[in-house]
Amino acid sequence: MAIKTESFILNIGPQHPSTHGVFRLRLILDGEVITDLEPVFGYLHRGIEKLAEGRTYLQDIPFTDRLDYLGSMTNNHAYVMAVEKLAGITVPERAEYIRVILDELQRIASHLAGLGFFLNDLGALQTPLLYMFREREKIVELFDMCSGQRLNYNYYRFGGFVQDLPEEFLPALKKLLDTLPGFIDEYEQLISTNEIVLIRTKGVGVLKRELAINSSAAGPVLRASGVNWDIRRNDPYSIYDRFEFDIPTAQNGDTYDRYMVRIREMRQSVRILRQAVKDLPEGEIMGKAPKLLKPPAGEVYSRIEGPKGELGFYLVSDGTDKPYRWRVRPPCLLNLSALKDMVVGWKVADLMAIFGSIDIVMGEVDR
């Protein structure tokens, strides 16, 4: 006699420690195997894009801090770069170098947080997270030196920065760059060959190259699937074309490769930082920008390579001091759209390992 079975619907979230935000997953299971997945988001929607259209261009900078709040510096950069392009504002040489320095520090800090939480989700409770937050804290202290904030920095301005780097910033940064590669080696010794990590991640949650491209995956998620695409190299912005660095990629597209790409990216960020500190010129940190900015009527799209992937801003100006349209292209939302392709066919026990490997921040997804 055949046994009659039925699919089981499992809801995870919207309050769940491994979703790292208010997010719900609706799973359909056959036993323990995931046969379908529906991501349900919007719980953190704040209407940022519409709010931004009712404020001046300058007043909108703090909104960008609150998208991916673990990547605020790069968010600031993407937005001010779009406005500068729209208004024809030139950025001084020193300010461009400082932007590269802050962007790469933010990339390292974001990867440290993402990897720490990912390993926490795997079951390595607290220890790897605290190891990585030990170094992230040093970067947060650098951001605090220049902006006065440990989160939501609001440091970038159209044409440069609100103020120059303090005297103690560069010595502290050089000290960090001397020690950070050794700590990355330590992470690899503890994690990259750990048998439990290998069992939980190798070959798990594979996102094939074609699916990664078709789903518009971005950043480490895309590069782990064998796609060599990085805005810093493929469409250079700021002064990234002056630096020597490699674009880490992998071929398997699994959970382990997404982890390894981020580890290697931190090493390349250190490489860029050393060049930027060595070549940092003296001079002005603020270009000529009007106090009340009214860009000429027109539209612009500007993009950068943030820690999570390609972050873009589309702006439409009607000639007033407020944007007519203010649109964000968030990499976290695009990476989340590929989650179903990664998890179908895997057991529910593997879900959080796969989900943690794409490093989602819901503030950017819901906006």
Curated annotation (Swiss-Prot):
Belongs to the complex I 49 kDa subunit family. The gene is nuoD. GO terms for molecular function: NAD binding; NADH:ubiquinone reductase (non-electrogenic) activity; quinone binding. GO terms for cellular component: plasma membrane. Its main location: membrane. Its EC number is 7.1.1.-. It catalyses: a quinone + NADH + 5 H(+)(in) = a quinol + NAD(+) + 4 H(+)(out). PANTHER family: NADH DEHYDROGENASE [UBIQUINONE] IRON-SULFUR PROTEIN 2, MITOCHONDRIAL, NADH-UBIQUINONE OXIDOREDUCTASE 49 KDA SUBUNIT. NDH-1 is composed of 14 different subunits. Subunits NuoB, C, D, E, F, and G constitute the peripheral sector of the complex. The keyword Transcription regulation does not apply. It is found in: Cell membrane. This is NADH-quinone oxidoreductase subunit D. NDH-1 shuttles electrons from NADH, via FMN and iron-sulfur (Fe-S) centers, to quinones in the respiratory chain. The immediate electron acceptor for the enzyme in this species is believed to be ubiquinone. Couples the redox reaction to proton translocation (for every two electrons transferred, four hydrogen ions are translocated across the cytoplasmic membrane), and thus conserves the redox energy in a proton gradient. It holds the Pfam family Complex1_49kDa. It is a peripheral membrane protein. The keyword Magnesium does not apply. It comes from Dehalococcoides mccartyi (strain ATCC BAA-2266 / KCTC 15142 / 195) (Dehalococcoides ethenogenes (strain 195)).
